């Protein structure tokens, strides 16, 4: 496990939860995750769940993605998706507003790996360098990704070579995120 990335993710999650506590006097609330089982759920309303991050259980790797492509995935991606269970968190990096993706449960972790495989299949078909997404943007065709060759974080337009460098590594990126509520 990449300790710098794990600590940066935990630190951002703490900043996010602290900001939520400050503004709402509660743990984060999600309507999107209502009805989806998770160890993160601490209470439920009639249409939403309150959640708090929990330690990841299970194998701490995305080896299913590696096996599917017979490639080695950046260690930071293994760490990013297996440090904790949590709800997705809204954030800002510079002037970019994003939703930082997280695994909600072991079932969700399997789904995330399937989506990463699908993303890599498309990139391979289009002969694009491999990236692994970590966040979504309001524009549906744009994501925040980690380049699997260099480890740098970029804003990427899906299906194209258009990429904008954001940070040299994932820990640096996470350390610069500001929570958005």
Curated annotation (Swiss-Prot):
Top-level taxonomic group: Bacteria
Keyword presence, Transcription: no
Family to which this protein belongs: Belongs to the Syd family.
Name under which the protein is recorded: Protein Syd
Keyword Cell inner membrane attached: yes
Gene name of the encoded protein: syd
Example of a GO biological process term: regulation of protein-containing complex assembly
Keyword annotations from UniProtKB, A to Z: Cell inner membrane, Cell membrane, Membrane
Bilayer topology term: Peripheral membrane protein
Compartments where found: Cell inner membrane
Any single Gene Ontology cellular-component annotation: cytoplasmic side of plasma membrane
Chain's role: Interacts with the SecY protein in vivo. May bind preferentially to an uncomplexed state of SecY, thus functioning either as a chelating agent for excess SecY in the cell or as a regulatory factor that negatively controls the translocase function.
Record-linked InterPro entries: Syd (IPR009948), Syd_sf (IPR038228)
